[in-house]
Swiss-Prot record:
This is Phosphoribosylformylglycinamidine synthase subunit PurL. The keyword Transmembrane does not apply. Monomer. Part of the FGAM synthase complex composed of 1 PurL, 1 PurQ and 2 PurS subunits. Substrate binds at S79, H80, N81, H82, R101, Q226, E298, S299, Q300, S520. Its main location: cytoplasm. Mg(2+) 1 binds at E78, N518. ATP binds at Y37, D480, G517. Mg(2+) 2 binds at D102, D254. It catalyses: N(2)-formyl-N(1)-(5-phospho-beta-D-ribosyl)glycinamide + L-glutamine + ATP + H2O = 2-formamido-N(1)-(5-O-phospho-beta-D-ribosyl)acetamidine + L-glutamate + ADP + phosphate + H(+). Keywords: ATP-binding, Cytoplasm, Ligase, Magnesium, Metal-binding, Nucleotide-binding, Purine biosynthesis. Pfam families: AIRS, AIRS_C, FGAR-AT_linker.
Length: 724
């Protein structure tokens, strides 16, 4: 990135002179889209972020939300998209490391990771290499630092072929008395740099993330990708937590984008102070580094602590006990400036608040667009349709299992509901939380968002909260990771603005605060153009009282009833069926009917917590066909889906509509479930029973389909040949 003339004029006016080379480099990174959110700050302000239980909202390294009077959950979400295309293994690994340190910087102990991933079609020349590298990077790093990866998403679409999306969400737990903020608010305090030595890896990473990828990116941009060291990260987690427990940490920041410049500047700006950094005191991994390189290096596994002078020796002693370097590199001042020194020489001096928050906001031109709602859909051959949908990489449970089997999802011994379900459940175990768990999920549907950005994003929120409800959880908060193309493209900027509007509307309707997030723009390639608009929604819920989870969810047994909850409507816009099977972009995108959706969520929580059901899944990508196959295929069932509450005109629409507000449950107490549904005002119908013979029989209108377990598993496993 380079500063434009308007930026330079503003900087000259503030400084009263031209910025020198070091100052200019710092402004280029701090005022990049990646750091400054220049195109989205004004849009994000409309999101509801406040609630009585929100302790720290947007603006710090991670959000903090109260669980009770003593404990809080810390949650953050980040993207590492460009680095993961250039170097998939290290790009993904350092994405994990960075978000873990964000959660750690708030004083929390990280307990879970989720990884929403998006790639091009598996038959793409470079895609299997990207998938393998990204999954190994996440697996190796997460497993070695001892934080379980318990959920996420996996999607394949041509728009991601040269710009994969690698998002990571991290959740931690902290005593409210031990929460640390990313600020330096006491002049005289000392800045201590802890962790790995500083090298040249990742220099300019913030600027690199603010540009589109090109044909030469794999080689030209490799120096902008950081290299991770999970062993050092593990020691950092232990050491920082010990220092926090002893009350020695007054402020803390991860050194991520723009490195030491960003960490020091934001701490000063948020604390209303200044900071002085001496680059001569920064431990280096490479000789001959220039001051600007030291200030902008994004070398991993480094954190900047604010420590009282009298506590410095104790903090350094703790770090050394765990084999970590810890060096005093500066101090907090009262002058409001970031002053960079090299020994006695002043290298740079700029107002901290101006550097952190002074980048002008940008409103780009936008170009509204729409796709036709009324589209002609050829009637398919039933056998071909069923096999095509169930063998899609976007449906295959086997492909997702191939991913999560590489992760240690049970380390720490907290994982009660494991990957493969609609939401993960993590038992908290701590004193006072023995009967409390967190439910975690991430969700997005870029195909819906592409066709209708606002309505599609509302649906992403509804699905995330619906998934929490399937395991009996009450929602606590949302975070978002907004992955879009260049805002300079008028269609993309329209998508971005409307998507954020949809997120805000849904959050207000469901009364769940959006407490933090990440914006990743310029996700496009000079050949392929922008990725599909991809707002990933992370949701955290709380469960109080865990007895029902001893026997839920479980595999359904022979004779249990299968019940479909909610109405299926003729809403196929952006569906897997229209886009992937027919190649049609258009149709009516599923609309969120908030009263109906809230009623379903309440019902799902009730029937789960009262052990009325053995298993449950919501209906989303791939419609009823994908949902019943995943839930019932391995055990076998006989289903008449024409009985489903519906308002559709064709059997294929009934089978593959992606209407919201629906779920499928199995139960040996059908009368109780139907009674609860009637009381909640949710349409419900028994559509068949579990047979236990390993054969899935589906009757819908004039069509009868039968698949045995082996056939179904063969379809699900068919995409794996690209990866094995």
């Amino acid at each position: 990135m380079t500063l434009d003339e308007r930026d330079l004029e503003l900087i000259r006016e503030e400084l009263g002179r031209d910025p020198n080379a070091t100052e200019r480099a710092m402004f280029e990174n701090m005022w990049s889209e990646h750091c400054a959110y220049r195109s989205t700050r004004h849009l994000l302000r409309q999101l509801p972020s406040e609630a009585d239980h929100v302790i720290v909202g947007p603006g710090d390294d991670a959000a903090v939300v109260a669980i009770d009077d003593e404990w809080a959950v810390v949650v953050g979400i980040e993207s590492h998209n460009h680095p993961s295309y250039v170097d998939p293994y290290n790009g993904a690994a350092t994405g994990v490391g960075g978000i873990v340190r964000d959660v750690l910087s708030m004083g929390a102990f990280p307990i879970a990771l989720l990884d929403p991933l998006r790639f091009g079609p598996l038959d793409g020349e470079r895609v299997p290499y990207l998938v393998d590298g990204v999954v190994r990077g996440i697996s190796d790093y997460g497993n070695r630092i001892g934080v379980p990866t318990v959920g996420g998403e996996l999607e394949f679409d041509p728009s991601y072929e040269r710009n994969p999306l690698v998002n990571v969400m991290c959740v931690g737990i902290v005593r409210r008395s031990e929460i640390v903020r990313g600020r330096a608010d006491r002049p005289g305090d000392v800045l201590v740099l802890v962790g790995a030595r500083t090298g040249r890896d990742g220099i300019g990473g913030a600027a690199f993330a603010s540009e589109e990828l090109g044909e030469e990116s794999e080689e030209e941009d490799r120096p902008a990708v950081q290299i991770g060291d999970p062993f050092t990260e593990r020691q950092l987690i232990i050491a920082i937590r010990e220092a926090v427990e002893r009350g020695l940490v007054k402020g803390c920041k991860d050194l991520g984008a723009a490195g030491l410049t960003c960490a020091a500047t934001e701490m000063a700006a948020d604390g209303g102070t200044g900071v002085e950094i001496d680059v001569f005191k920064v431990p280096l991994r490479e000789e001959g580094m220039e001051p600007w390189e030291i200030m902008l290096s994004e070398s991993q596994e480094r954190m900047l602590l604010v420590v009282a002078p009298e506590d410095v020796d104790e903090v350094i002693e703790i770090c050394r006990k765990y084999g970590l370097e810890a060096s005093v590199v500066g101090r907090v001042t009262d002058d409001g400036y970031l002053t960079v020194k090299d020994g006695d020489d002043v290298i740079a001096r700029v107002p901290a608040e101006f550097l952190a928050d002074g980048a002008p906001e940008v409103e780009w031109e936008e170009e509204p667009y729409s796709y036709p709602e009324n589209v002609d859909v050829p009637e398919p051959d039933p056998e071909d349709l069923v096999r095509s949908v169930l063998s899609s990489p976007n449906v295959s449970p086997a492909l997702r299992e191939w991913v999560y089997r590489q992760y240690d999802h049970e380390v720490q011994g907290r994982t009660v509901v494991k990957p493969g379900h609609d939401a993960a459940v993590m038992w908290l175990q701590h004193e006072g939380l023995e009967d409390v768990a967190l439910a975690l999920t991430t969700d997005s549907n870029p195909r819906h968002v592409l066709i209708d950005p606002k309505t599609g994003t509302e649906g992403c929120v509804a699905e995330a909260l619906r998934n929490l409800a399937t395991v009996g959880a009450e929602p606590l908060c949302l975070v978002d990771c907004l992955n879009f193309g260049s805002p300079e493209n008028p269609r993309v900027y329209y998508q971005l603005r409307r998507s954020i509007e949809g997120l805000g509307k849904a959050a207000r309707e469901f009364e769940v605060p959006v407490v933090g997030g990440n914006v990743s723009l310029y996700n496009e390639h000079e050949v392929d153009g922008p990725v599909n608009p991809t707002p990933v929604i992370g949701a955290v819920g709380v469960i109080r009282g865990l007895d029902y989870l001893e026997d839920f969810p479980r595999e359904p047994e022979e004779g249990e009833a299968v019940i479909v909850l909610g109405e299926t409507r003729e809403e196929l816009g952006g569906s897997l069926y229209l886009i992937e099977y027919h190649g049609i972009k258009g149709g009516k995108v599923p609309r969120v009917r908030y009263r109906e959706e809230r009623a379903l969520h309440d019902l799902l929580r009730r029937i789960a917590r009262k052990n009325m059901v053995s298993s449950v899944t919501d209906v989303s990508t791939g419609g009823l066909l994908a949902a019943v196959a995943e839930l019932l295929g391995p055990v076998g069932a006989s289903l008449s889906l024409s009985e489903v509450p519906n308002s559709v005109s064709r059997w294929d629409f009934l089978l593959l509509s992606e209407s919201h507000g629906r779920a499928i449950v199995t139960t040996d107490r059908p009368d109780d479930v139907l009674g609860a549904a009637e009381e909640a005002g949710v349409p419900a119908q028994v559509v068949g029973e579990v047979t236990g013979d390993g054969v899935l029989r589906i009757s819908v209108g004039p069509v009868d389909v039968s698949l045995d377990r082996e056939e179904l598993e063969e379809l699900w496993r068919s995409p794996l040949h690209y990866l094995e």
